[in-house]
Swiss-Prot record:
This is Protein NifX. It comes from the Bacteria. GO terms for biological process: nitrogen fixation. One of its GO terms (molecular function) is metal cluster binding. It comes from Herbaspirillum seropedicae. Pfam families: Nitro_FeMo-Co (PF02579). Belongs to the NifX/NifY family. SUPFAM superfamilies: Nitrogenase accessory factor-like (SSF53146). InterPro entries: Di-Nase_FeMo-co_biosynth (IPR003731), DiNase_FeMo-co_biosyn_sf (IPR036105), NifX (IPR013480), NifX-like (IPR034169), NifX/NifY_domain (IPR051840). Keywords: Nitrogen fixation.
Length: 146
C-alpha cells in the first residue's frame, strides 16, 4: 500500500485500522476478518503501517476468545473501520478507547483515508477530535486558567 506524501516530523500520527479480507476494501465483520490493515494518518498524508493476519476458524461461533488477539493488534489505533461488529466486540473495542465506525457498504480503504484526511484539515467532529488525542498525555495547567 502506498505512502501518501512524506511523513511529517512534528505532527503526531493517528493510527486507523480496517477490517478486511482482501486488503483493498473494508468489507469484513470484525470478528471474522482475516486481516486488519493499519495506517498512520495526518491532515497532510497517510502511510501504511502493517497488516495483522489471522488464521483459523473465524466464523460466528460465540467464541469471544478469538477477539483478544485482534484487540491487541489494534490497541494503538484510534479508529476501527468495519463492515459489521458484534455487541461484545464493539464493547471491547470501545473499552480500549478505539472508536468503531461501520461502513454502509464495502468501501476502498484508500478512499476512506482520503475522506478522513480532508475532515482532519477542517474542523473534525467532537468524536474524531477525541479519537485524535488517543495516546497523547493530557496536561492541564491550572495556573493559566482565570
Amino acid at each position: 500500500m502506498p505512502w501518501r506524501w512524506p511523513r511529517p516530523f512534528k505532527e503526531k500520527a493517528m493510527k486507523v485500522a480496517f477490517a478486511t479480507q482482501e486488503l483493498q476494501r473494508v468489507e469484513a465483520h470484525f470478528g471474522w476478518a482475516k486481516n486488519l490493515a493499519v495506517f498512520e494518518l495526518w491532515p497532510n498524508g497517510y502511510s501504511f503501517v502493517q497488516t495483522h493476519s489471522f488464521d483459523g476458524d473465524l466464523k460466528e461461533d460465540g467464541d469471544e476468545d478469538k477477539l483478544a488477539p485482534k484487540i491487541e493488534a489494534i490497541k494503538e489505533c484510534a479508529i476501527l473501520y468495519v463492515a459489521a461488529i458484534g455487541g461484545s466486540g464493539a464493547a471491547r473495542v470501545v473499552a480500549n478507547r478505539i472508536h468503531p465506525v461501520k461502513v454502509a457498504q464495502a468501501e476502498p480503504i484508500l478512499d476512506i483515508l482520503d475522506k478522513l484526511q480532508e475532515v482532519l484539515k477542517g474542523t473534525p467532529a467532537p468524536w474524531l477530535r477525541k479519537a485524535m488525542q488517543k495516546g497523547q498525555e493530557r496536561v492541564i495547567n491550572f495556573e493559566e486558567e482565570v
